[in-house]
């Protein structure tokens, strides 16, 4: 049994908001930890499920009786202490740690539903990938959660393909977490030790870092870059072209992060360039995502079959989301607002293919300025 270096009078209650492919995989490992560490966590882990019917049965009923998410994570047995719940308020109330794992376009609606319903001492972790863009600048999704719910939110991001994690194949991740002083106080701290105990498994290693901005930006932009990789795959250009896309993508990600103050991103400290090259949330996540994730698959299908992005998403993902499609638009809007399009030729070229009938054949010319 793991012993906390800090006294824990009442074990922490953990819940998961989201039950898609990645949401269920994360819920599985968290529930495993909660069952094994009763001195730190309460045993049962509620997982909010957007209710659907599968062959005449409610998805929550299937998960709770057969312990399998047959739609989003089939053929993976889930812990019996993972409880599917269709009521979002009931899921989060009284939770000490709330893990958000939903498509980022739904975040605003979800947090509004639970505003004022969560414990003021709760903490949150965002597994979402994306940015909240407005004419004034850019907000991290974790900051959006904090601003609405008035609880501190960190970020989990890394080279994590959901099915591999769910099968127990070894991988690692980054948790970016730095609690500001105004959120500290008696009974209010869930420290990095607790987070590591909640997420770390023998097959899922966790490194806790402080760079929330860097991890968030890398997690958002890698999905756009992965779309570019899918485009060149669809065009049949091979591994050399994919490597070039990833190199330019890393460079543009670091450049994007350097504008964090201009973009008015709230942060306790500036992004650390080492996050992008040394942490799982950086280059490792980019490599994994560009090696065959859903963004690559959708983008590849677009080019091979000459269909638009949303049609490809519907056909390939069957109801799930390709976050790169939406993020490409958000990033373009941000760069346009600050007149920075010319500094990000890859991100802009990707946007044009998705939204302006641009051609992947133009990539070599559009990226010439990066050389």
Swiss-Prot record:
Transmembrane segments: none annotated. The keyword Oxidoreductase applies. It is found in: Secreted, Cell wall; Secreted; Cytoplasm; Peroxisome. Induction: Mildly induced by estrogen (17beta-estradiol). One of its GO terms (biological process) is carbohydrate metabolic process. It holds the Pfam family NAD_Gly3P_dh_N. InterPro entries: 6-PGluconate_DH-like_C_sf, 6PGD_dom2, G3P_DH_NAD-dep, G3P_DH_NAD-dep_C, G3P_DH_NAD-dep_euk, G3P_DH_NAD-dep_N, NAD(P)-bd_dom_sf. NAD(+) binds at residues 18-23, 50, 106, 162, 294, 323. It comes from the Eukaryota. Substrate binds at residues 129, 294-295. Keywords: Cell wall, Cytoplasm, NAD, Oxidoreductase, Peroxisome, Secreted, Virulence. Its main location: secreted. GO terms for cellular component: cell surface; cytosol; extracellular region; extracellular vesicle; fungal-type cell wall; nucleus; peroxisome. Its EC number is 1.1.1.8. The active site is at 222 (proton acceptor). One of its GO terms (molecular function) is glycerol-3-phosphate dehydrogenase (NAD+) activity. Interacts with human CFH/complement factor H; the interaction is direct and enables the pathogen to evade the host innate immune system. Interacts with human CFHR1/complement factor H-related protein 1; the interaction is direct. Interacts with human PLG/plasminogen; the interaction is direct and provides active plasmin on the surface of fungal cells. NCBIfam families: glycerol3P_DH. Belongs to the NAD-dependent glycerol-3-phosphate dehydrogenase family. May catalyze the production and accumulation of glycerol during hyperosmotic stress conditions. Glycerol acts as a osmoregulator that prevents loss of water and turgor of the cells. Mediates evasion of the host innate immune system by binding inhibitory components of the host alternative complement system, in a manner dependent on estrogen-induced inhibition of EBP1. This is Glycerol-3-phosphate dehydrogenase [NAD(+)] 2. The gene is GPD2.
């Amino acid at each position: 049994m793991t012993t906390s270096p800090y006294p824990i009078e009442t074990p922490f209650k953990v819940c998961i908001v989201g039950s898609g492919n990645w949401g269920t995989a994360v819920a599985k490992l968290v529930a495993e930890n909660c069952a094994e560490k009763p001195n730190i966590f309460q045993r049962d882990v509620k997982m909010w499920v957007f209710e659907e019917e599968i062959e005449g049965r409610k998805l929550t009923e299937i998960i709770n009786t057969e312990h399998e998410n047959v739609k989003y994570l089939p053929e993976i047995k889930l812990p019996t202490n993972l409880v599917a719940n269709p009521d979002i308020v009931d899921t989060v109330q009284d939770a000490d740690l709330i893990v958000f794992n939903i498509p980022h376009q739904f975040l605003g609606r979800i947090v509004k539903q639970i505003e004022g319903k969560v414990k003021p001492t709760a903490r949150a972790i965002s597994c979402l990938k994306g940015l909240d863009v407005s004419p004034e600048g850019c907000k991290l999704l974790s900051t959006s959660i904090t601003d609405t719910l008035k609880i501190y939110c960190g970020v989990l991001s890394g080279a994590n393909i959901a099915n591999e994690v769910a099968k127990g194949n070894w991988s690692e991740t980054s948790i970016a977490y730095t609690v500001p002083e105004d959120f500290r106080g008696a009974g209010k701290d869930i420290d990095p030790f607790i987070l590591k105990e909640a997420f770390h498994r023998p097959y899922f290693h966790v490194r806790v870092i402080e760079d929330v901005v860097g991890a968030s930006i890398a997690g958002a932009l890698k999905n756009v870059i992965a779309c570019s990789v899918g485009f060149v795959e669809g065009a049949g250009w091979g591994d050399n072209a994919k490597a070039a896309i990833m190199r330019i993508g890393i460079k543009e990600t670091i450049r994007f992060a350097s504008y964090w103050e201009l973009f008015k991103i709230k942060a306790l400290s500036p992004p650390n360039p080492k996050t992008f090259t040394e942490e799982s949330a950086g280059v490792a996540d980019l490599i994994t995502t560009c090696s065959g994730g859903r963004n690559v698959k959708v983008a590849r299908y677009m080019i091979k079959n000459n269909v638009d992005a949303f049609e490809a998403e519907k056909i390939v993902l069957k109801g799930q989301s390709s976050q790169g499609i939406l993020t490409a638009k958000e990033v373009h809007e941000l760069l346009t607002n600050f007149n920075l399009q010319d500094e990000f030729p890859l991100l802009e070229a990707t946007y044009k293919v998705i939204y302006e009938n641009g051609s992947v054949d133009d990539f070599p010319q559009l990226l010439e300025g990066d050389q």
